[in-house]
Amino acid sequence: MSAFPDSMDQKFHNMTVNECFQSRSTVLQGQPFGGIPTVLVLNIILWVFVVLLYSFLRKAAWDYGRLALLIHNDSLTSLIYGEQSEKSSPSEVSLEAERRDRGFSSWFFNSLTMRDRDLINKCGDDARIYITFQYHLIIFVLILCIPSLGIILPVNYIGTVLDWNSHFGRTTIVNVSTESKFLWLHSLFAFLYFLINLAFMGHHCLGFVPKKSLHFTRTLMITYVPTEIQDPEIISKHFHEAYPGCVVTRVHFCYDVRNLIDLDDQRRHAMRGRLYYTAKAKKTGKVMIKTHPCSRLCFCKCWTCFKEVDAEQYYSELEEQLTDEFNAELNRVQLKRLDLIFVTFQDARTVRRIYDDYKYIHCGRHPKQSSVTTIVKNYHWRVAHAPHPKDIIWKHLSIRRFSWWTRFIAINTFLFFLFFFLTTPAIIINTIDIYNVTRPIEKLQSPIVTQFFPSVLLWAFTVTMPLLVYLSAFLEAHWTRSSQNLIIVHKCYIFLVFMVVILPSMGLTSLHVFLRWLFDIYYLEHATIRFQCVFLPDNGAFFINYVITAALLGTGMELMRLGSLCTYCTRLFLSKSEPERVHIRKNQATDFQFGREYAWMLNVFSVVMAYSITCPIIVPFGLLYLCMKHITDRYNMYYSYAPTKLNAQIHMAAVYQAIFAPLLGLFWMLFFSILRVGSLHSITLFSMSSLIISVVIAFSGVFLGKLRIAQRYEQPEEETETVFDVEPSSTTSTPTSLLYVATVLQEPELNLTPASSPARHTYGTINSQPEEGEEESGLRGFARELDSAQFQEGLEMEGQSH
């Protein structure tokens, strides 16, 4: 196909503009230099304001006394913006860092000068992998700035398609004539960017070895076991007969413990309240409280529901009631057995042999039989390596088969329609235009209206969407936390890329247009016009403004943590007593959400890579975002979040997504070549070939990486014991939390027996109050409970992965 002359390029460009965007649309109207200078200045001003505001709040909340801050300080700013001293004991915080952190803005400079070693010692090995990943992206984008600004940008600018008045448009690929040989540079660099990125991700993977602790255990998880089997000896007998020499050391049955876990949480909460008010009553006398959830919002004492009651008696009676309900449910749990068991064997080779025997059972292969085969029905079993006990979400094990898949499909179908069709910012603003809401401002033609507001709106949706995905993952009821986190990583990234990059880029700016594009066969005949929307200069400016907003306003708001503030305020206003508020404060020490942060960062990285060739000015702003994101994450990981231990598969998922990002740039170049120079042009053929080669290389690299890891684990394991695989006779010192039994079933009466409750003694008994030392000891144990649980869990899981 012959190339169009420059006049045809200009005519086609004008037709595309009129077709992609309505004349009154406030989304991507043409502005001087795309409105980028205005958006940049506004974001700098807002970033400075947010940082100064955060510095003030942080200084006002500064307190080195951890216990005083947690128990006695009711300051809202202290509870939200307090330092890591809220989450760790003073011995875990560097005294030198505290001494250097006394100035108004010293926290900012400390984040810049903080050594990686200090961050890793404080936050663990996952933090090291995360910041190393950021280092690779920063260096990669820094290298991309050289050809993007030094070669591609001048080539675009010297083009002759657009007028000299089109300042921003002249920096894009639209300004390059279809007859120009310089278009070869764009295709070559798009392929080169992919290869460089692949090399950087390969180098990053050398820095850590993904490990699955489940391959180092000698425990198998077996499903579809008949629930009528109550005797573990039947399971042991089957394995002894079917696999001679096999020694079963332990068999754990699983039960439906959803209600039991909820009751246990409630009675523990009541116990905390009783301990707190018993100790307080000894010092200050009887304490009266309001028990209605909205009592903090209403000061009226005339209503019955807002009457004050004796706090100690209220929590004592509540604890007694919940303990009775718990014990009754505990007796019923034995009748709620699930068709799932955990079987631990003596040696790892036996585990490998049994696992291989059941690996292909779904393909019609029959496993070995025994004299009890008709009872255990092992031909229906599904066998897998058992995850770490601390990784299992026990209350979700009862949701299986049809119910689980129905729930999963329904939730994700709803999210699909919500994010793809309804919440794209361009769709929302165009829908507003339909109802003439924007008519009063259509004559303003202000970059603040046409560029800054849509970019802020897009950023707001990219912040809200991962939160909804994160909450939906809990509704999906995954069996393990690792699978739940992996789902969050992949879903967030896929939804973000479609919502931010693909749909708006292709000009699908209204639900009506999308449905026509999807179903109207006559409308599809004009699909060429729609795909031209990818290469409009204003389209590139919109995404540059989005990257700028994410780099400045976005990172500033990550420091503020408004989500935590809103959550805290809601929970605080609905709390009924001081113990609940103490518990809420301690719960502010949440884990750093690596999956969510990976998705946010890689979404912006994908935007940069998609437009790095067609709109090269976006690359330095992408570098700005990565640097600002890195500094913000360093601060948040060190000061604001609790240490986190993850399955390394999450880090590998981020690597795969980063490898995918440059493919968007290759897709965009292929679309441009097909639409502008024809499907049989040599540049189009080269773009298609490079895209196919890149896809093959990417998938081959992912496949070979997974195969290499799988082969490593296929090798015979060393006879290394894990703490939950040892013989029963040697588990006297084994923590019960490391057994394949739900925690609530291990020692359900620990520290919560009805005999320890004052409610059991005060009615008709004398001298039944616990000793003061006992109460204070219980209160101290309550204060330590949340502090150590998360970090200890991370240490246990880390120990299993080595």
UniProtKB/Swiss-Prot annotation:
Its main location: endoplasmic reticulum. It holds the Pfam family RSN1_7TM. One of its GO terms (biological process) is glomerular filtration. This is Osmosensitive cation channel TMEM63C. Keywords: Calcium, Cell membrane, Endoplasmic reticulum, Ion channel, Ion transport, Membrane, Phosphoprotein, Transmembrane, Transmembrane helix, Transport. Monomer. Belongs to the CSC1 (TC 1.A.17) family. One of its GO terms (molecular function) is calcium-activated cation channel activity. It comes from the Eukaryota. Residues 753-785 are annotated as: Disordered. The chain crosses the membrane at residues 36-60, 125-157, 181-205, 402-431, 447-476, 481-517, 541-573, 594-612, 616-640, 648-676, 682-702. It catalyses: Ca(2+)(in) = Ca(2+)(out). It is a multi-pass membrane protein. Disulfide bonds: none annotated. InterPro entries: Csc1-like (IPR045122), CSC1/OSCA1-like_7TM (IPR003864), CSC1/OSCA1-like_cyt (IPR027815), Csc1/OSCA1-like_N (IPR032880).
